[in-house]
Design a protein with these regions (language model features):
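Extracytoplasmic
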Residues: 41, 49-53, 65-66, 73-77, ...
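Generic structural motif
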Residues: 50-54, 82, 86-96, 122, ...
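Intrinsically disordered, low-complexity
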Residues: 6-52
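Short glycine/threonine/proline-enriched tight-turn/helix- or strand-capping micro-motif at secondary-structure
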Residues: 33-37, 59-89
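Conserved, short, structured surface segments that act as functional micro-motifs
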Residues: 133-176
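Short, small-residue-biased leader/transition segments that mark boundaries at the very start
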Residues: 2-3
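Zn2+-dependent peptidoglycan hydrolase active-site motif and core
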Residues: 90-125
Length: 176
């Protein structure tokens, strides 16, 4: 899998060669538009990122049964049923801080929503984003993939986790 980091991209347009100028990338950076700011707090609301129903709710105070694993575990996320190929939208404005592939959640995107809050979207494919990208609420984060082996009985689903300063929070508390 290829993970794109926009901060590392280097194109001839950035160096001024296509415009015929000798302006350096450093000079162009000084005149670039300011970075988008994001803000989220305990009173903010999240849009639903997928159209399905919750098949496993957030539960960090008691264990819940995971059918595929045939065991009880704590669940730091909300697991939302969906159709493979379904578009997953950002629940809030954010900046992409991580794109990775894990055994449990497959292709996973993390958005910094501001003020210590992050949203984690797992079980994705065809992610059109790169680290550093600004994503507006409702904008495509990726498309739902087939489930990993950890969720094969549950079927295609979105792994949706919200954290505050690295600590898992119940996404349902913030949902519209």
């Amino acid at each position: 899998m290829c993970i794109i980091d926009r901060a590392e991209e280097d194109t001839s347009a950035e160096n001024g060669s296509e415009t015929g100028t000798n302006e350096s990338a450093e000079t162009q950076t000084e005149t670039a538009a300011p970075a988008k700011q994001v803000y989220f707090d305990e009173n903010s609301t999240l849009a639903w990122p997928a159209s399905g129903s919750v098949i496993l709710g957030y539960s960090m105070d008691k264990t819940v049964f995971f059918q595929t694993l045939e065991q009880y575990k704590y669940n730091p996320a909300m697991i939302i049923a969906g159709e493979a190929g379904e578009m997953i939208g950002a629940s809030a404005d954010g900046i992409v801080t991580n794109i990775e592939e894990t055994a449990q959640t497959g292709v996973t995107v993390t958005l910094d929503m501001g003020n210590g809050y992050s949203a984690v979207y797992g079980q994705l494919k065809d992610v059109p984003l790169a680290i550093g990208d600004f994503v507006a609420q409702g904008q495509t984060v990726g498309y739902l993939s087939e489930p990993t082996k950890y969720y094969s009985v549950e079927g295609p689903n979105l792994y949706f986790e919200v954290t505050k300063d690295g600590e898992a929070k119940d996404p349902a508390v913030y949902m519209e």
